[in-house]
């Protein structure tokens, strides 16, 4: 087997397998090591596949550290390839560090021979070729020539590379072994240092515990001198109970300290310290004060509880805090609970206030005292957060949240709840509830009772109502002796006018209301603010729709009616017809046996005007109208407008009290300070008493017509009320828009179903009442297909912002008795926005109606022409099928619409392509004649079918 052949190629390759040293497989894991005094530390533990010596196997380590003499016996005679192998094997086992010596109580370790043999000797036979290659290598002379001849250059290079790689791996393994030994040495040194530190702390802790035990013993002896009975009980308990663990004085003949531990067994933890304050020891032999002494029974019980766990368990729980070094005996306050003394190292304890609360709670539990529940009156608004509710009840928000969780509601302290839920919570916690609302800011402003002793007679407020063009304003003009009608556009009243006249030394306040149907709301406001209603009826026109509406408003307001039959000077006047027509509406005049006063007047010729005023004064005397002029003013807004030079101007009627310049008032959602008072003749007055109409200057904004106003104490109150009303108005507007708008899907469905078109408008008027009338009139014009959408409306001139809004919404601008400024006109020209001006509401409504009619889709009208019966069907080249027909009814026109009817079922509708008679195109074929007809894009025609001819017309519609 020693002979080599040329084909034995594996001779020089196999030995290099013995040179490879596998990298030691290291697995790391982390464990938590516990030390005394409750300290823990995370330790990295490495698990290796190679078997290392443990600290308790000292003989094995020493044997492993020495080189094995038997293995390298033939090393000097081996080939150079085997030298690195033995060197690396010896080097791998050489750098094993000597472990720390085990204590003398440790058991002897096992023999070392079985440990070292598998490490080196078992690797070599695995990679050797069978047949004793190692024994034959000392004879190179016999094989040297043969070996050189059989090894090729590539094989020599492979062997050289294998040797170089083995040397590199050897160096790496040696460096890795050195680092591992260094790390283990550092780890052993650190552990030794920690053990020394732990032993030192344990010794200090034992010394401190001994000192505390001695101090406690002396304190108990001092207390026993004053209280002999508790001392006897304490002694009996001490005799019947073993000494506490590491805390009691030792018996005679027994050394101080803990219980001795058996050999080879670690100590079972440090003694548990008694939780007493350090300053309890007597200083300089002086007895402690009575306040610092504990009761003997209580101290023994506490010691039993503290030491019981140490006696029963294997190891007591270590103390968290580090021992404190006492500087001197006179340091009395050393044991005081402070932040610095209780937060040393990792320890942490309760604060002084927490300890005090705990002591108070313990005292109450011992004395069986319960904390008295304080019931409070909790003010709850309409909405409140849980945190604010807890603060008002002086309760913890956690308790409220727990209560709500029991009720099945998961809420946070910042969540908002309503008043009902807050009331339930407050009552559940034993508090009384006082509900308040945002509307409470208006309490005490309106409907304040008058002082009956200070009331005086006031002028009556008379409203003139009736149908349009029945002479209401002409009658008021005749009474005032002033030409009011000539100043109004179109001769009709556009807004309420309030005037005051004097008759026989007595004042009468008149309110003129429009008679047009669009001004229904203004008539209603006039009736609500009045004492007497004069119903004007034309003698030649009798009762009209607006007359009936005025009667209903007066009855709804509960005011008496005086009928003024006007235009008696006309030839067609019939006053008796008017009285009879009023009977149908339950208005019974005196001449017809009723109680309603009626006067025949002529505003044009000023006939019987005195009788009408006397009837008004008589009715006012029967009503006995009184008011308190010394109280704060209260009334109603008749009309409001935005004047360019004076700002917001409101025409108001004082109902109670007296209004002065400088008063702060609230009108609807607006407030302001009265800057000036102007009467109906344009004169500035210093005060306005009850039933006096005046114009107020100084409001922050333009109020709505019909709003009530009242004088308040200060600006803060006025601002609060105005903000509350503005918030209500915004909420209503949002709710109305959201309810009308809905979701996008609903809008699209509505448009698909109804196909509603909108006509957007921006309306600006002179007064708020006129804008309201225009809005109501335009709403009535709307249908299911088209309606007017008012993007914005307001009192005042047309501004540039109105033009921008109209441009954004693609709306038209309408000005009623107002004009646009220069900037607005220029902007409208640039943007292409149309601005229309109107003075009469009739014209405005007619134009908008015509524009809305243009949005309507034209109506499709169908006119029947005639029927024709198909007699024969012909196939004609380049034309298709042609029906030979006879007109049986009416006529058939070329280009008319046709329907193909088969068995009384319409199977096709289209247009007639050709209409011929004897090969000639004709315009129409009358009844009884035959013709040929062809349809557009349709050939399915049969003999016997009926053709119906009709004409379609599209007619534009109007509203």
From Swiss-Prot:
Which Gene3D superfamilies does this UniProt record tie to the protein? P-loop containing nucleotide triphosphate hydrolases, Translation factors, Translation initiation factor IF- 2, domain 3
Q: Where is the composition biased (Basic and acidic residues)?
A: 1-10, 154-225, 232-241, 318-333
Q: Please, which domain of life does this record's source organism belong to?
A: Bacteria
Q: Where is this region: G5?
A: 602-604
Q: Where is this region: G4?
A: 566-569
Spell out the residue ranges making up region: G2.
Answer: 491-495
UniProt-annotated stretches for the region Disordered: 1-374
- Cell compartment(s), UniProt: Cytoplasm
Q: Residues that bind GTP, according to the entry?
A: 466-473, 512-516, 566-569
One Gene Ontology cellular component annotation held by this UniProt entry: cytosol
Annotated Low complexity bias: 63-118, 128-138, 246-284
Which InterPro entries does this entry report, sorted A to Z? EF-G-like_DII (IPR053905), EFTu-like_2 (IPR004161), IF2_assoc_dom_bac (IPR013575), IF2_II (IPR044145), IF2_N (IPR006847), P-loop_NTPase (IPR027417), Small_GTP-bd (IPR005225), T_Tr_GTP-bd_dom (IPR000795)
Gene Ontology terms, MF aspect: GTP binding; GTPase activity; guanosine tetraphosphate binding; translation initiation factor activity
Q: Which family does it belong to?
A: Belongs to the TRAFAC class translation factor GTPase superfamily. Classic translation factor GTPase family. IF-2 subfamily.
Is the Lipid metabolism keyword given for this protein? no
Q: What does this protein do?
A: One of the essential components for the initiation of protein synthesis. Protects formylmethionyl-tRNA from spontaneous hydrolysis and promotes its binding to the 30S ribosomal subunits. Also involved in the hydrolysis of GTP during the formation of the 70S ribosomal complex.
Gene this chain is encoded by: infB
Name of this protein: Translation initiation factor IF-2
Species of origin: Brucella canis (strain ATCC 23365 / NCTC 10854 / RM-666)
Keywords, comma-separated and alphabetical: Cytoplasm, GTP-binding, Initiation factor, Nucleotide-binding, Protein biosynthesis
Ranges annotated as biased composition (Polar residues): 27-37
Can you give the residue ranges of the tr-type G domain?
A: 457-626
């Amino acid at each position: 087997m020693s002979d080599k052949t040329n084909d034995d190629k594996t001779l020089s390759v196999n030995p290099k397998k013995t040179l490879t040293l596998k990298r030691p497989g290291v697995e790391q894991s982390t464990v938590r090591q516990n030390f005394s005094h409750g300290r823990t530390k995370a330790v990295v533990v490495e698990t290796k596949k190679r078997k290392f010596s443990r600290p308790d196997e000292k003989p094995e380590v020493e044997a492993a550290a020495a080189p094995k003499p038997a293995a390298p016996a033939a090393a000097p005679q081996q080939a150079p390839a085997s030298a690195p192998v033995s060197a690396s094997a010896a080097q791998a086992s050489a750098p094993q560090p000597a472990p720390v010596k085990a204590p003398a109580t440790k058991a002897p370790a096992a023999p070392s021979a079985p440990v070292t043999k598998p490490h080196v000797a078992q690797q070599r036979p695995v990679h050797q070729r069978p047949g004793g290659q190692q024994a034959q290598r000392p004879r190179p002379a016999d094989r040297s020539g043969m070996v050189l001849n059989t090894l090729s250059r590539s094989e020599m290079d492979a062997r050289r590379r294998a040797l170089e790689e083995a040397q590199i791996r050897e160096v790496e393994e040696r460096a890795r072994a050195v680092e591992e030994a260094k790390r283990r040495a550092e780890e052993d040194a650190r552990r030794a240092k920690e053990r020394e530190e732990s032993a030192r702390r344990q010794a200090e802790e034992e010394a401190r515990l001994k000192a505390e035990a001695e101090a406690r013993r002396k304190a108990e002896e001092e207390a026993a001198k004053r209280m002999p009975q508790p001392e006897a009980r304490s002694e009996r308990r001490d005799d019947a109970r073993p000494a506490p663990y590491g805390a009691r004085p030792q018996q005679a003949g027994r050394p101080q300290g803990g219980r001795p531990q058996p050999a080879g067994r670690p100590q079972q933890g440090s003694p548990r310290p008694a939780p007493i304050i350090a300053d309890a020891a007597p200083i300089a032999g002086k007895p402690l004060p009575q306040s610092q002494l504990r009761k003997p029974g209580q101290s023994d019980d506490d010691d039993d509880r503290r030491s019981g766990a140490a006696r029963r368990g294997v190891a007591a729980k270590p103390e968290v805090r580090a021992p404190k070094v006492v500087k001197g005996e006179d340091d009395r306050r050393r044991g005081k609970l402070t932040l610095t003394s209780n937060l040393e190292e990792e320890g942490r304890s309760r604060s002084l206030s927490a300890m005090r609360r705990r002591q108070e709670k313990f005292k109450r539990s011992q004395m069986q005292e319960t904390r008295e529940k304080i019931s409070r009156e909790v003010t709850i608004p309409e909405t409140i957060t849980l945190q604010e509710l807890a603060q008002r009840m002086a309760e913890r928000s956690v308790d409220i949240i727990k209560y709500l969780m029991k009720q099945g509601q998961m809420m946070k302290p910042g969540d908002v709840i309503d008043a009902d839920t807050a009331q339930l919570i407050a009552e559940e916690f034993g508090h009384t509830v006082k509900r308040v609302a945002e509307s409470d800011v208006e309490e005490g402003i309106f409907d304040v009772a008058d002082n009956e002793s200070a009331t005086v007679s006031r002028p009556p407020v008379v409203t003139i109502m009736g149908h349009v063009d029945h002479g209401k304003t002409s009658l008021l003009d005749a009474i005032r002796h002033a030409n009011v009608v000539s100043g109004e556009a179109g001769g009709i009243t556009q807004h309420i006018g309030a005037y005051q006249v004097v008759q026989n030394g007595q004042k009468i306040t008149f309110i003129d209301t429009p008679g047009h149907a669009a001004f229904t709301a203004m008539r209603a406001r006039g009736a609500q603010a009045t004492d007497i209603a004069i119903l004007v009826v034309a003698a030649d026109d009798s009762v009209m729709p607006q007359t009936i509406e005025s009667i209903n408003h007066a009855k709804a307001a509960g005011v008496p009616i005086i009928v003024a039959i006007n235009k008696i000077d006309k030839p067609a006047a019939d006053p008796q017809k008017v009285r009879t027509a009023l009977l149908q509406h339950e208005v019974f005049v005196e001449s017809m046996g009723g109680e309603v006063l009626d006067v025949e007047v002529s505003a044009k010729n000023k006939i019987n005007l005195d009788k009408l005023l006397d009837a008004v004064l008589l009715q006012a005397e029967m009503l006995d109208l009184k008011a308190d002029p010394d109280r704060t003013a209260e009334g109603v807004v008749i009309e409001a407008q935005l004047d360019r030079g004076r700002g917001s101007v409101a025409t108001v009627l004082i109902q109670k009290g007296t209004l002065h310049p400088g008063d702060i008032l609230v009108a609807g959602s607006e407030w302001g300070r009265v800057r000036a008072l102007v009467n109906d003749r344009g004169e500035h007055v210093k005060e306005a008493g009850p039933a006096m109409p005046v114009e107020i200057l100084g409001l922050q904004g333009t109020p709505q017509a019909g709003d009530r106003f009242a004088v308040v104490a200060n600006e803060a109150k006025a601002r609060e009320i105005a903000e509350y009303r503005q918030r209500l108005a915004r909420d209503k507007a949002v709710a109305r828009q959201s309810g009308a708008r809905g979701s996008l899907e609903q809008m699209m469905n509505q448009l698909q179903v109804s196909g509603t078109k909108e006509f957007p408008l921006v309306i600006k008027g002179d007064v708020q009442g006129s804008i309201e009338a225009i809005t109501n009139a335009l709403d009535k014009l709307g249908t299911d297909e088209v309606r007017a959408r008012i993007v914005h409306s307001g009192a005042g001139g047309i501004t540039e912002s109105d033009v921008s809004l109209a441009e954004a919404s693609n709306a038209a601008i309408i000005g009623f008795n107002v004009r646009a400024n220069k900037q607005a006109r220029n902007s409208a020209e640039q943007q292409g926005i149309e601005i229309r001006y109107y003075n009469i509401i009739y014209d405005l409504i007619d134009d908008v109606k015509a524009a809305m009619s243009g949005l309507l889709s034209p109506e499709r009208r169908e006119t029947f022409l005639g029927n024709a019966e198909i007699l024969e069907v012909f196939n004609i080249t380049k034309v298709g099928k042609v029906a030979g027909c006879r007109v049986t009814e009416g006529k058939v026109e070329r280009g008319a619409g046709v329907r193909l009817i088969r068995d009384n079922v319409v199977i096709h509708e289209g247009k007639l392509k050709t209409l011929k008679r004897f090969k000639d195109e004709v315009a129409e074929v009358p009844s009884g004649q035959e013709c040929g007809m062809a349809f557009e894009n349709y050939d399915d025609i049969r003999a016997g079918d009926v053709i119906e001819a009709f004409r379609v017309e599209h007619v534009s519609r109007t509203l």
